């Protein structure tokens, strides 16, 4: 009876004034159990649906993407935060976070920023890996973050890490093209990587092949060109990047400098309110002897505090003024760059230019002080920095006349440079000055479109300087090769390129060799 009574007690459930018996209890318990299971399973399903990561380039994300690629980092960051609130499962704001980290670290090179921002890349990668792999944006996003991290690693001297990240980026983009052939969103990055890998000399291609990276400069550039000029949804969305990357590749990889600047002009890029495009145009113009154009772009840009403050504005505007022999205008700008820029790139080059400006002004105390700093500050990753250090080690000040001609030529003032040098060859008795004089005249004639005269002076430069460590002979060989290649005289051009490659121990060897190989 005890056992029976216990059972009755356990099964007597009061519902209002009604007493439910064992049979009805069992039925009610069963129904409630089913409801509980259904609720539990429904909750799991609902949670899974809510937790499903998505890639949504909604209006807020598009606006944030546009702002960050104008280098308006603070407004972009606010929009990214807003997008995360709108949909915490959206991975596009996570990707855009990496853009802010990339631009700040790559352009400013501040070690203090590096300490807390660089580790964000790993967190971003981990977050993006939670996305659905059956979406082409999965590989696209990861490939972008890896290449961004690689570029930052290169700037901070972590070359091994950068190499592995470049491979990761390449492999993800390559896999995407095979898996989703209709997806064009990563044509820009994949094409750029293909083009760069395609420039690797044949003697080293075994290494890229071993790493699974095979590329073609021609096919890669074709892919990038099609994307930069494309009209599909991805080409339009990512045009802020393609209009930055494509002209750079045209200029430096293809050596099509006029085409690069023409692209910027034809696309009517906003060089006032988009600082990324303004920086691109100013930099390429400066490197194409159009320093007056550089000066105009920098001085007329939107100076709102919304934009990240780039020290390179001071450096490039200082260079542009120096090339015009505006020494008083150049000095404070170059000084500001060397004092405020936290990175290493172009510091030695800027200090050399600062020393030249003071030297030409007759302020030898300031000139010597700037030269001494070349030994103490900055890196030697760029050819310009290497050359600055090499010339500082010589301990000799350049011939003032040749220096002025050099600066005028670099700035695009060829007529003024020719007027300065013409008929004065006999004034130069030093062998190195004689070599530079012949080279400078060759460059001036080329800039003036007198190619036959230029080639004659380039040949004389090679004859005088082939066995010297100065870069003049190697550069003369490269310039002669480029003139002949444009004329269709390919075999003669190849001969000059081979001469350029054969010359050792000059400061611009890396960049000149790259151009000769291309």
Task: Give the positions of each predicted feature.
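Generic helix N-cap/helix-start motif at coil->alpha-helix transitions
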Residues: 54-60, 135-136, 183-184, 202, ...
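Alpha-helical repeat scaffolds
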Residues: 79-80, 115-129, 161-172, 212-228, ...
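"A position-specific structural signal for the A-helix of alpha-solenoid helical repeats
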Residues: 62, 96, 103, 141, ...
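Alpha-helical adaptor scaffolds
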Residues: 244, 251, 286, 402-412, ...
């Amino acid at each position: 009876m005890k056992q029976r009574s216990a059972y009755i007690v356990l099964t007597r459930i009061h519902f209002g004034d009604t007493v439910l018996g064992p049979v009805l209890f069992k039925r009610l318990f069963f129904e409630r159990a089913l409801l509980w299971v259904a609720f539990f399973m429904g909750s799991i399903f609902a949670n899974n649906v809510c937790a499903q990561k998505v890639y949504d380039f909604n209006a807020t994300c598009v606006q944030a993407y546009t702002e960050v690629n104008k280098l308006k980092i603070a407004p972009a960051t606010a929009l990214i935060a807003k997008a995360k609130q709108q949909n915490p499962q959206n991975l596009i704001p996570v990707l855009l976070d990496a853009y802010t980290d990339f631009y700040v670290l790559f352009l400013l090179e501040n070690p203090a920023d590096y300490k807390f921002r660089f580790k964000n890349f790993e967190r971003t990668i981990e977050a993006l890996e939670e996305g659905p792999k059956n979406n082409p944006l999965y590989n696209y996003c990861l490939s972008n973050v890896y290449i961004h991290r690689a570029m930052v690693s290169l700037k901070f001297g972590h070359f091994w890490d950068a190499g592995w990240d470049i491979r990761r980026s390449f492999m993800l983009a390559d896999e995407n093209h095979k898996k989703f052939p209709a997806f064009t969103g990563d044509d820009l990055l994949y094409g750029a990587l293909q083009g760069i890998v395609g420039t690797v000399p044949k003697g080293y291609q075994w290494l890229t092949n071993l790493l699974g990276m095979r590329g073609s400069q021609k096919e890669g550039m074709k892919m990038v060109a099609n994307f930069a000029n494309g009209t599909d949804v991805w080409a339009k969305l990512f045009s802020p990047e393609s209009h930055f990357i494509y002209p750079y590749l045209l200029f430096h990889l293809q050596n099509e400098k006029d085409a690069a600047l023409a692209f910027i002009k034809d696309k009517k890029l906003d060089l006032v309110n988009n600082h990324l495009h303004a920086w691109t145009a100013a930099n390429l113009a400066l490197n194409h002897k159009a320093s007056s154009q550089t000066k105009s772009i920098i001085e007329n840009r939107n100076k709102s505090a919304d934009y990240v403050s780039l020290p390179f504005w001071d450096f490039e505007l200082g260079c542009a003024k120096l090339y015009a022999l505006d020494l008083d205008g150049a000095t404070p700008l170059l000084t500001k760059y060397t004092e405020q820029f936290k990175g290493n790139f172009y510091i030695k080059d800027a200090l050399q230019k600062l020393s030249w400006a003071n030297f030409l002004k007759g302020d030898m105390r300031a000139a010597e002080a700037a030269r001494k700093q070349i030994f103490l500050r900055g890196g030697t990753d760029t050819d310009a920095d290497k050359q600055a250090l090499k010339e500082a080690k010589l301990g000799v000040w350049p011939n003032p006349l040749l220096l002025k001609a050099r600066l005028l030529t670099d700035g695009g003032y060829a007529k003024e440079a020719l007027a300065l040098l013409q008929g004065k060859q006999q004034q130069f008795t030093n062998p190195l000055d004689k070599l530079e004089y012949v080279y400078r005249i060759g460059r001036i004639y080329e800039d003036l479109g007198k190619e036959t005269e230029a080639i004659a002076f380039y040949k004389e430069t090679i004859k005088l300087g082939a066995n010297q460590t100065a870069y003049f002979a190697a550069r003369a060989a490269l310039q002669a090769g480029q003139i002949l290649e444009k004329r269709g005289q390919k075999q003669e051009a190849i001969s000059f390129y081979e001469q350029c490659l054969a010359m050792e121990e000059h400061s611009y060897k890396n960049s000149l060799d790259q151009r000769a190989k291309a």
